């Protein structure tokens, strides 16, 4: 009789014809009993490329042990990672968003190719998180995501954004070389993902809210007993999911994605969450659009006073209880759907039932009557500069509107050099284009320019718009994901120096002061300003990637 717990591995190892397969597996440690067990793949993103992932092999070992102890046979395999923090501001950053697709494709390929019945995915650096979940949703086999964990604070509560902003301070002459080197040497003390509510911590929190991580997985330091235990529990959880036939399609829904968006907003999370949640929803067959972020954002406040716009680090949020008490606050306020299923086999409300509130003395997560911002910091803007939408991150500290004069650059490097050379005046709207998914290719993050702006003391005096992305560490008056992008003839590619641009975060508008006849005249003479690769992964990506307004996916319609 067929073992219903082994719908995929049985095809690989059962019967006379699969004798060669069993022979191969014996060489990697299988014994007679292992062939009777469900096989669980452990997808590790370990790499010495980045501190975000340097410890994940050990975490994979703990996940393997947890799965084996629960009665499965676990098999560890690896995939790649690209370090955003290291490649930022260089041509290598073009490969960052591309790596999301490569990681997703490779996990799907390994799990489906080897016939694993379930999977634990473990991610550290930014693109790991959405990539792992996208693969889980494509495969639709019992699976749990484990976050590799956040880094400990550096000296004087420094983190990677401290280093980027120190570059701008050095260029402005407000610090000297010795002070810059001191920041460089003390900001990153060891393993773990970047320490504010940047993209990695944002996405880990979103995935926990989505129901595909165990409770508290998003709020544990990388080097901690809690994180090791999380991995062991994840291995066992996948075995339980196999036994009760609980799959991602039983967990993810429009309601669960609304929960994820709600938590991202309450935490003041990264603009990258918009791009990644759209992509994840596409892989799960869920109808999610940019406008859903606006609808939810009208009712959900920002409650967490965390970096980059706030004061506190993720490690400090962990100390007071992580995001589970916040989620319970949101549930009790009627802002979360409590009846959605999670990977524990229980509903969200059941998972949160016994969660204790934050200590009364803490001021990291605020009460609803004293929010950091009364509505969402993530704004979806439309207008003649962004007919298909753009994404802004508006904390309110930089104001709610900006009107200025365009200064156009056709690459990140051109803009960064102008900022560092002191050539950007107050009242300027810096336009960085041809950095979209197709135009980059790869949709680079603009952390170097935004950090240089902040370091130069121009954070409240200039704005930046781009068809590229922003790091979760970016803050200031910044608008990204402008669509259509310049490379496909979008209006951002028609701008000229001196054009007047208006950004209105209250009206959710992004516009240039030009009538349609002038835009049509410019469009008629527009030509692509840069060459795109003709070979290799960037060429394949540019040919297949969708608009950022649809998640920049490569397997869509």
Regions found by a protein language model. Give the residues of each.
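Catalytic or ion-coupling anion/metal-binding cores of large enzyme and transporter domains
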Residues: 1-54, 59-80, 85-86, 91-96, ...
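Glycine-rich, highly charged phosphate/nucleotide-binding loops
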Residues: 96-105
């Amino acid at each position: 009789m067929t073992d219903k717990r082994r719908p995929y591995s049985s095809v690989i190892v059962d019967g006379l014809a699969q004798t060669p397969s069993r022979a191969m597996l014996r060489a990697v440690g299988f014994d007679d009993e292992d062939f009777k067990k469900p096989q669980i793949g452990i997808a590790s993103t370990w790499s010495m490329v980045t501190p975000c992932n340097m410890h994940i092999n050990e975490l994979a070992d703990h996940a393997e042990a947890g799965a084996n102890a629960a009665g499965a046979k676990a098999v560890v395999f690896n995939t790649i990672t690209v370090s955003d923090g290291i490649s930022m501001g260089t041509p290598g950053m073009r490969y960052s968003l591309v790596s999301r697709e490569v990681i997703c494709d490779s996990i799907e390929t390994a799990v489906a190719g080897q016939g694993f019945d379930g999977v634990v995915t473990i991610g550290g650096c930014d693109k790991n998180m959405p990539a792992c979940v996208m693969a889980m949703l494509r495969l639709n086999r019992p699976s749990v995501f484990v976050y590799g964990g956040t880094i400990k604070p550096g000296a004087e509560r420094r983190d990677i954004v401290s280093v980027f902003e120190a570059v701008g301070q050095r260029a402005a002459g407000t610090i000297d070389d010795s002070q810059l080197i001191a920041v460089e040497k003390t900001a990153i003390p060891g393993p773990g993902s970047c320490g504010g509510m940047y993209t990695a911590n944002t996405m880990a929190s979103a995935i926990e809210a989505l129901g595909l991580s165990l409770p508290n997985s998003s709020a544990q330091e990388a080097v901690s007993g809690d994180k090791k235990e999380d991995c062991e529990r994840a291995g066992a959880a996948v075995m339980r999911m196999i036994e009760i036939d609980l799959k991602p399609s039983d967990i993810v829904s429009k309601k669960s994605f609304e929960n994820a968006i709600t938590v991202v907003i309450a935490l003041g999370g990264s603009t990258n969450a918009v791009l990644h949640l759209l992509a994840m929803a596409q892989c799960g067959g869920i109808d999610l659009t940019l406008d859903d972020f606006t609808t939810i954002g009208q009712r959900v406040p920002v409650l967490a006073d965390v970096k980059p716009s706030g004061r506190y680090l993720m490690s400090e949020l962990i100390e007071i209880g992580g995001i589970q008490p916040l989620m319970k606050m949101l549930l009790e306020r009627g802002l979360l759907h409590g009846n959605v299923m999670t990977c524990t086999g229980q509903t969200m409300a059941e998972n949160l039932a016994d969660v204790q509130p934050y200590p009364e003395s803490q001021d990291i997560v605020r009460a609803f009557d004293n929010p950091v911002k009364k509505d969402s910091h993530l704004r979806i803007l439309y207008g003649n500069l962004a007919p298909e939408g753009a994404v802004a991150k508006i904390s309110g500290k930089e104001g709610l509107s900006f009107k200025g004069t365009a200064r156009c650059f056709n690459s990140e490097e051109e803009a960064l050099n102008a900022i560092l050379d002191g050539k950007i005046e107050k009242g300027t709207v810096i336009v960085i284009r041809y950095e979209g998914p197709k135009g980059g290719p790869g949709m680079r993050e603009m952390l170097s320019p935004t950090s240089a702006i902040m370091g130069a003391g121009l954070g409240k005096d200039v704005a930046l718009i781009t068809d590229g992305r922003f790091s979760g560490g970016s803050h200031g008056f910044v608008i990204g994901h402008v669509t259509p992008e310049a490379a496909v003839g979008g209006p951002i590619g028609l701008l000229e120096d001196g054009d007047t641009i208006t950004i209105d975060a209250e009206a959710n508008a992004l516009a240039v002061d030009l009538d349609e006849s002038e835009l049509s005249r410019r469009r008629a003479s527009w030509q692509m300003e840069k060459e795109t690769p003709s070979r290799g992964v960037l060429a394949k990506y540019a040919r297949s990637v969708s608009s950022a307004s649809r998640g920049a996916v490569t397997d869509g319609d």
